[in-house]
Amino acid sequence: DMDFETAPAVQEAIRERAAHGVFGYTLIEDDWYEAYQNWWKIRHNFEIPRDWLIFCTGVVPAISSIVRKMTTAAEKVVVLTPVYNIFFNSIYNNGRNILESPLKYENGAYSIDFEDLEEKLADPQTSLMIFCNPHNPVGKIWDKETLEKVGDLCVKHHVLVLSDEIH
């Protein structure tokens, strides 16, 4: 919604790009990789190898790709419910089974039912947990102790954690 005409140079650049005929993400520039590597190096003094980085067109396609690549058909994926409904789609659409671990709601606050969660993680068919922090839709920001406990349980039961922390 612009109140003025687009600059002729911009119009011409759009025409040139449209003439190319390919509108997907065809080439990922080195700058893209370097931006991520530099961010982690500056903020966390951690060097990420380039081959750890994979370009995705969004969070939802990334989650679906991870579910597909890191699990096999008929394996189980744990989610803490209620949860962002797209997680269900990413699991079901890839032929995986969902295990719901309902959050507890007591005294106006949500918490993880660790007894139930461990039972679900201990299932030999469980290979992945999709974790959301802050939790969507309840808005809970999990504290360090909770995160460590979830991590410890996943390590104990050899379950990979996919952590969605976009918000």
Q: Model-found features: residue ranges?
A:
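Conserved PLP-anchoring active-site segment centered on the Schiff-base-forming lysine
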Residues: 69-91, 118
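Short, solvent-exposed loop/turn segments at secondary-structure junctions
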Residues: 1-4, 32, 60, 84-85, ...
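A short helix->loop->beta-strand "cap" motif at the edges of active sites that frequently abuts
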Residues: 75, 96, 156-160
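A short helix-loop-beta submotif of the ANL/AMP-binding
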Residues: 93-99
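Active-site phosphate-binding strand-loop segment of PLP-dependent enzymes
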Residues: 103-167
